[in-house]
Amino acid sequence: MKSQAFFLLFLVVLLLATTQSEAFLGALLSKIFGKRSLRDVDTMK
C-alpha cells in the first residue's frame, strides 16, 4: 500500500509540474489532438 500512496503522490507532483508550464502542456495537447485549441474538439461533438 505504501508504494501505491507514493505513486499517487508522484502523480500529483507531476500534475502540478505540468500546470506550472501551460505552454508545454498546450503544445503536448496540440500534438495529441492535432488541434490548435480544445474548442475545436468541442465543436466536433
Curated annotation (Swiss-Prot):
Expressed by the venom gland. Its main location: secreted. The keyword Signal applies. GO terms for biological process: defense response to bacterium; killing of cells of another organism. The modification Phenylalanine amide is found at F33. Residues 37-45 form a propeptide. Keywords: Amidation, Antibiotic, Antimicrobial, Cleavage on pair of basic residues, Cytolysis, Membrane, Secreted, Signal, Target cell membrane, Target membrane, Transmembrane. GO terms for cellular component: extracellular region; membrane; other organism cell membrane. The keyword rRNA-binding does not apply. It is found in: Secreted; Target cell membrane. Residues 1-23 form the signal peptide. It comes from the Eukaryota. Amphipathic peptide that shows antibacterial activities. Belongs to the non-disulfide-bridged peptide (NDBP) superfamily. Short antimicrobial peptide (group 4) family. This is Amphipathic peptide Hj0164. It comes from Hottentotta judaicus. The lineage of its organism: Eukaryota, Metazoa, Ecdysozoa, Arthropoda, Chelicerata.
